[in-house]
Amino acid sequence: MADSSERDAGKSAAAGACAVPKTKGRRVQGRRVVESRYLQYDKKAKKVSGAAKEEKPPEGRKASTVPRSREESQVMGTGNLQSTMLEGHGMNPPDLDLSAIDDKILSRKASWPDREMTDKAKSTSFISCDKKRILRKKRRDLQETMDMMESQTLLMTLLSVKMENNLALLEERAEKDLAAMCHEKERLQRQALELRRQLLLRQKHQELAATLDAQIEVLSPLQPVLERFKEEYMTLGRALDTTRHELPMQAVHMEGSGQELLDDLEPALRITLQLLGDLSICSPYATAQVQGASAQEPGASTQLSCLLKELKGLVTEKDLELRRLVSQVVELSSQASKEAALMNQEVWEEAEGALTSSQWYFSPDACRDDSPS
């Protein structure tokens, strides 16, 4: 234990003797001091190794074993240097001052692991930077893709809303146009029906005009005959007006002549005049004549009254007989007209033939069906 403590003290003294304070380079008159580059390199390597120790190793990689090897080398450096030692001499090594040699060896051994450590740290830092850059790029690309998808989704939503609004407007406009077209169609249909009705009416008027023209052409030669017929008809009417008071006398059969009838009616007329005079209806001159006639013949009034009664009874009987005779005559005339019509029909059918008569009595379709093919 005493030997190891003395050895450590010697090493520290040698290290203190070898250590040179770090001074900045400055210009001195007459000479120039150049610092040792070996010490500067050692310091830089130590700084780089310390920075590499602070950095964390990337995931999936094992921590470097350089510090452990360095410690082992330091331990081995402080141990025995002789490999052929006898038993018992390992505990009491020779008392040699190897501090300078150990310091050089340790500094060299420490420099090489630091270099390896810095290279590995640089490589790992480069790899980690590349991975971080790739991850950042991927994240950036993913974010850009998500932003683009969100913008496209928003645009699609806006387009769908616009399409729905435009579709609603188009539907409303189409409904209005359809209603207007329906109204226009109804108006045109009414106009077409009105024009068709007017056309049919004009066609009927034209047909009637053509028929009237044909009738006028056919009847124009008969106009003189019509004028002559009018004149003859007027003459017949005037003749009937002048002779109508004598017509019943020709149709009624009476016994005796007209003079005898007048002689029979003269007393009745006188009584009528007298009665009218009493009622102050007849003139006084006629009443005086009737009274004079009655004064000359005192029994004439009673005779006239009897005659009037008999005339009344006779007229009543004749009236009944005339009514009965008139009904019989009407019946006979109807039968005679029937017989005459049947005879004329038979004669006409014989003259015209069966086909023409069938057209008069039956419809044309029935005649076509019954006609021989």
Swiss-Prot record:
Skewed-composition ranges (Basic and acidic residues): 1-10, 32-43, 52-73
Region annotated Disordered, chain positions: 1-76
Residues the record lists as N-acetylalanine modifications: A2
GO biological processes: cell division; centrosome cycle; spindle assembly
Coiled coil, from the record: 130-204
GO cellular component: centrosome; cytoplasm; HAUS complex; mitotic spindle microtubule; spindle pole
Keyword check for Coiled coil: yes
Quaternary structure and interacting proteins, as annotated: Component of the HAUS augmin-like complex. The complex interacts with the gamma-tubulin ring complex and this interaction is required for spindle assembly. Associates with microtubules. The interaction with microtubules is strong during mitosis, while it is weak or absent during interphase. It is unclear whether this interaction is direct or indirect. Interacts with EML3 (phosphorylated at 'Thr-882') and TUBG1.
Family (UniProt): Belongs to the HAUS8 family.
Protein name per UniProt: HAUS augmin-like complex subunit 8
Lineage: Eukaryota, Metazoa, Chordata, Craniata, Vertebrata
